[in-house]
Amino acid sequence: MVESEEQGKLIAWNGLRLVIPQQWETIVRDKRHLIFEQDLHPLLELRWQRSTLSGDSEKKTAAILAQLEKETSNPVTHVKSSAPLGALQKIYDVAAFSLGTAGFPDGAVLICKSCATIILIRFFSGTEDWLAKESNPFQTLGCHLPQGTEPTWAIQDISFQLLEDFHLDTYTFAFGMSRILFKSSSTDVIFYRLAPASTHLKQSSFEELFRRFNDSTHPIEKSDREHSLVSRHSPHPLQYLLARLSRKKPFTWSHFRHLPEYDRILGLHLTASHPIKQELTIFLLSNYGVIS
């Protein structure tokens, strides 16, 4: 279990972090592109990237707004920053903009003064209402962690940590199943979330689910953790040689955990080109849980 933020829901995705109202839903559009909505009504859009543009903040902002003008076919004009955006000015260079003639900002370009990350914020119709009523999510917006801190991820109702050398590769957020794949130079890690677990377990046994999602024919063991299964495989020397010739990762480790109190199943599946260290599996298991 992972503790939730006191007055909201933590979202931490690929370097960006903020706390949003509990009733908001998060839609992942791309590796660095999120949309937040309530009752199927979009409210806020965030896109970000590490800066590859030359020049100072003013030149970078001008280049981004010129591109936005092409995308939207609307004239982009600078406007005065609204009060909710004011909380960002200690950390970011902030340039609010309007698409057309609206006096209220339609969004803003932020450039971090510390790491030069560029964040594009877009507001949707009705934004004025929730900015007036809700706690300001921009007060919690951050794009980098203190040096030596392992990256934290929090999406939907799960949270986990990874070592710095892993990067996001692919993801799937389907009804009842989430799958997020990370890669390093030698190891792949897949995080699974099955919800509601009770629905999946009516259709298949826990062991069948374990084998299906991990594509495993290796022996399954009972884990030391309650309601958990684990499987591990180390290849024979000839298997290892053949796997390396075909650039496959022959070492595997899988773990599935049923959390009846949350009606969730959380899974981990690792493949590696070398033996998987116990320290890594302990780290991943200890930091993977449901946000309560």
Identify the residue ranges that each predicted region occupies.
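N-terminal targeting sequences that direct proteins away from the cytosol to non-cytosolic compartments
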Residues: 1-292
